[in-house]
Each structure stands twice: as structure tokens, then as C-alpha cells.
Regions:
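N-terminal hydrophobic/helix-forming segments and targeting peptides
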Residues: 1-432
Length: 432
């Protein structure tokens, strides 16, 4: 893959992924165009050797895999997450303030709050609509497509300390303005009325919703030599696209099952039925193995397969900030063009160990892929990600990797395009 194609694929995913549900839709579209067949998690039909399948997990997470051609010695797994720090719209959200309608929101994950101010914001997510069967409501995706909300700053004349750093409160400072009250006598239910009209349904048919405030700005290639990509949701759509590229652009192996999993809810701890902290991955792995023809169906045989498996957990890493180099480890700085970052933490906030590091090093050296090692500054406590969580539920060696970015958890982040290409190349080599 060349640099421009790598960037183009990522940019297209970002444009189509206003919410995690839209990321799911775009990922499924890419997989189906590449010949992957959808199967149900509840099915137990025999899988065809060499064939490619995908499974939707509660419409919130996704697994795609290629069945081995013959035999079954282990899994080669790459994981990522589809959610990002943002704000979600609460029930009964409309509030009258001055002559404006604002929306009551809840913080999702750990966003850098002030980066959401004064930006054009969209609303996207899903609504559940009543049907004749109460146990089977209909789900519909929603995307306002155009900017419909803004969270305005307080003018410096009214907030003289703003440039010294002012704490923002979600309930007080971060309710987005979405309309003027005007002649609207009753604003309760106003938002659902707008959404229902766009979807062509009755407002009272909407039973519930999960709606996100989203940064609606376009990704932008920047730098005098076009080195950078500035965009919303680089955490963690960079990794999602590398996962998809790897599973789509490689063929089934003889006796190893290549598998990618895109999880939801990483940004809020992964403790959900569709998150990495659930039993869902181990259940999928076991079903794949048991439904593959000519495998030993014993529990012991499956455990042996897992012990011969390897997982790469992909999530963005911290590049060294040029204005704050003191925040990085003094002997392990991470350049923007660091390529594949091997994330290490001896207290196991990252799952990486010496054996896993050596495997990644070997692949990168053989393929001449840029790579480096990340450790936290000795006086800082870093974040965790999927690798350590997955290591508690599946007995497979795991390594945490990512591309280096700046402004992680900002509403708009920055990366070097070459690092995305390096991760694309690594993920493909990992599956070969």
C-alpha cells in the first residue's frame, strides 16, 4: 500500500463515522465489498475452509475472520475500538436559556473539554422505533449531516481569567445551543420531532435513542509538505482502518485463523456486553473453532489452540509534544513519524511482554517498517487500553501497539501520515 491510498482509506472512514454506529455501518460496507459473508452469532452452521465471514455483536461491535484452509493451530487476532470521547444527549434534553434552546448532555469517556467549544457540531447515533412486537423494536441510524449545534465560549470580557485556565463544568458550561426559541411555545420533545421528521416517522414512535454530539469538521492534510493529518476521531479510527485493511487485503492461511475485532465502549472502561471486558471474544473464538470442519471438538483441544494464539491490540499512542518534551520519558521519545509504537508498561497497564515485543520487532525489521517503543515518564501514570483487559479473558500472548498522535482525546487530533502507513503495513504483515 502507498501513502496516498493509506490516507484516503482513513479519511473516508472518518467522514462516514460520525458515531460508533456509523463506524459499524461503514466497516460492514467495506467487508461486504471485499466478499465477507455475514453470519449470526446465534448460528452454529459449519464454516467453509478458506472463506471470509463477519459477525455483528449487538450492532455495537464487530468481528471479521478468515477460516483456515486446512487444520487449525491457532488464532492471529488484531483488535481495536470504535468509540471516542465526546458527549451524549440525555433523555428529555431540551432546555430554555435566554432566547435559545440548549441540550442537556453527558460526558462520554475523557474528552479535553475546551476543544469542543466554538466548533460546528453534528448529532448522530441511533433511535429505536416501536413495532407490533415489543420485544423487537426497529433500529434506525440518524445523522444530522450538517452542523446543528455549537457550544460557545464565554467572551473574555466576562471571563478575564480564561487564558490562565478555567475549569469547565459539563452541566453549566457545555450545553450546546441548537436553536432559537422564537415562536416555539413548547420545546419539550422538540429534538425528537426534528429527528422523526428527517427519518420519516412519527415522533411518538421513538422509544429511546443513543445520540452523540460529534465534531462535524472535515479531516485536513496539513504541513508544508503534506506530512500531517488533522482530524476528529483519530483515536481510534486509525486502528480500525488498519484492522480492516489487514483482514481484507490478505488471504486465508493454511492452519491459522486471522481475525479482527472492533470493540465498543473502550473509552468508558470496556465493561459492557459488547466491550473487551466481556466474555464475547472468548465465545466467538470458541464458536469459530467448533464450527470449523475437521477440528477436535474437545475443550482441551480448543485451549491448546488458544495457547498457540497471538493478539495485537491497536490503539493510538502519545507522540512527543514539541512544546512539552518534558512530559515524555527522557530516553524513549516518540517522534511523530515513529510508525508502529510498541506500548510497554511493567505494571501491566499495557499487556506487552518481552516475547510479544520480540515478535513485533522481528516483523518490523523483516518488513523494514518504522517502529519504536513507548514507556511513560517515570512520574506519570498513563492510560490503559484493550490489551490488558483481553489478557484476563483469553490465554493468548498479547501486545499493545498504536500510531503516535498529538492532542489525544481532543475533539481534533494530529498525526503523521507516514505512521498510519507503517501501521497498515505491519497489520498486513502480521496476518501473513
Amino acid at each position: 500500500m502507498e501513502l496516498q491510498e493509506s490516507t484516503n482509506r482513513l479519511v473516508e472512514l472518518i467522514r462516514h463515522s460520525q458515531s460508533p454506529y456509523h463506524t459499524m455501518k461503514e466497516a460492514i460496507s467495506q467487508l461486504e465489498k471485499a466478499g465477507f459473508e455475514r453470519i449470526s452469532l446465534a448460528e452454529s452452521a459449519a464454516l467453509e475452509p478458506g472463506k471470509a465471514y463477519y459477525v455483528s455483536i449487538y450492532d455495537r461491535s464487530l468481528a471479521a475472520f478468515r477460516v483456515p484452509q486446512s487444520g487449525f493451530k491457532g488464532f492471529c487476532i488484531i483488535t481495536s475500538h470504535i468509540d471516542n470521547p465526546c458527549f451524549m444527549i440525555k433523555p428529555n434534553p431540551e432546555r430554555k436559556k435566554s432566547d435559545c434552546i440548549t441540550l442537556n448532555v453527558e460526558r462520554y469517556g475523557g474528552p479535553i473539554l475546551n476543544t469542543w467549544l466554538d466548533r460546528p457540531l453534528t448529532i448522530a447515533g441511533r433511535v429505536c422505533v416501536a413495532t407490533d412486537d415489543p420485544f423487537n423494536p426497529k433500529t434506525m441510524l440518524y445523522n444530522s449531516k450538517k452542523p446543528v449545534a455549537v457550544i460557545p465560549n464565554l467572551a473574555i470580557h466576562m471571563n478575564r481569567e480564561v487564558n490562565k485556565g478555567v475549569e469547565l463544568k459539563v452541566q453549566t458550561d457545555l450545553e450546546p445551543i441548537v436553536s432559537l426559541i422564537g415562536a416555539k411555545e413548547n420545546t419539550q420533545g422538540w429534538l425528537l420531532g426534528k429527528i422523526a421528521a428527517e427519518l420519516g416517522i412519527e415522533a411518538d414512535s421513538i422509544l429511546d435513542y443513543e445520540l452523540f454530539l460529534c465534531n462535524g469538521e472535515e479531516p485536513s492534510i496539513t504541513g508544508f509538505d503534506d506530512e500531517f493529518l488533522s482530524a476528529p476521531r483519530l483515536d481510534n479510527l486509525t486502528s480500525c482502518q488498519s484492522c480492516l485493511n489487514a483482514i481484507m487485503d490478505t488471504e486465508a492461511l493454511s492452519d491459522i485463523c486471522n481475525l479482527v475485532v472492533l470493540f465498543d465502549n473502550e473509552e468508558c472502561g470496556s465493561s459492557s456486553k459488547q466491550g473487551a471486558g466481556s466474555v464475547i471474544l472468548s465465545s466467538i473464538l470458541e464458536k469459530i473453532y467448533l464450527n470449523t470442519p475437521d477440528t477436535d471438538k474437545s475443550r482441551t483441544a480448543f485451549i491448546d489452540v488458544m495457547l498457540h494464539s497471538l493478539t495485537a491490540s491497536l490503539d493510538v499512542a502519545h507522540a512527543m509534544h514539541p512544546n512539552h518534551p518534558e512530559k515524555n520519558d527522557p530516553t524513549n521519545p516518540i517522534p511523530m513519524e515513529g510508525g508502529v509504537v510498541i506500548k510497554m508498561n511493567y505494571n501491566q497497564r499495557y499487556a506487552t511482554d518481552t516475547n510479544a515485543v520480540s515478535i513485533v520487532e522481528g516483523i518490523c525489521r523483516a518488513e523494514k517498517i518504522a517502529h519504536t517503543k513507548f514507556v511513560n515518564h517515570g512520574d506519570a501514570v498513563g492510560g490503559g487500553t484493550l490489551g490488558s483487559i483481553l489478557s484476563t479473558s483469553i490465554p493468548a500472548m498479547t501486545v499493545d501497539l498504536g500510531v503516535p498522535i498529538l492532542a489525544m482525546h481532543s475533539s481534533r487530533e494530529l498525526m503523521a501520515r507516514s505512521s498510519q502507513l507503517a501501521m497498515d503495513q505491519f497489520a498486513e504483515a502480521f496476518f501473513k
